[in-house]
Amino acid sequence: MFFMNKESYFINLFQNQYIGDDGALLNNTVYSMDAFFENVHFKREWMSLEQIAAKSMLVNISDAIAMNATPKYALLSVAFPSSFTKDDMKELYRGFDKVAKAYGCEIIGGDTIANIKLDISVTIISQTSNPLLRTGIKEGDLIAYTGKLGESKRDL
């Protein structure tokens, strides 16, 4: 909980009308971005590289869907450990590609860098004509979710 207080504090420093939802809405385009870092969000011993890449895409795509937006494009930033082989990179690619294709999302670029562990950041660019915003929620509205709340945190 201590970190979440720091996160909220940091976000509030920007005092920006676009910050505070699952993504930033500008002219019917939703921009969302999440980091997925080794030993923070996942452990490589628990998931295959394909699963790690797929999950990093899915958590970002879910932000777009939560805002009633259709994912169109993705930008990937991947920090590779020096121990990574070409086969490891192909396995990551398969996870990214499989999810992108399943949701009709095209990977259009990004960045790579060497690192001591695997870190991934994904930006999703989505389109919506009828966005759902947190600011519009009111008492009595139906809130829906999938899975079990808190499960990702519990797993680490």
Protein language model annotation of sequence segments:
Residues 1-156:
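Helix-biased detector of long, well-ordered alpha-helical tracts
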